[in-house]
Amino acid sequence: MGACTNSNYAMQYELPGTYAPIADFDLCRRAAEAAEKFGYNYKVGNVFSSDTFYTENAHNDKWINMGVLAVEMEAPALYMNAARSGNKALVICTVSDNILTGEATTAEQRQNSFTHMMDVAFSLL
């Protein structure tokens, strides 16, 4: 539901502290309800967003110990832009590759999981 980051994206807002980018609760609740209704496997929680997705010293174990579910690259910027413009936002991620194990989904698994993500997203409209 939130997005941790090592990016300096928030600096542009010149805030006197650290901004914690989060999803809109209503969108998150409705997306979880839709995933339940469709019978899809899903998780709700924090992601880690980085400007460098693959890096030699990512400290992934430390993020895992903090309960972070996945690594991606855009969530904080989306949440901050939405907050700044007075809009709601929700990041819905579909896991295709495991950067810890090297495991990757097949083309068929990827197609199905992306379709599931789109079903949930379209249900929010």
Give the residues covered by each predicted segment.
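Glycine-rich phosphate- or other oxyanion-binding loops that anchor nucleotides, phosphorylated ligands
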Residues: M1-L125
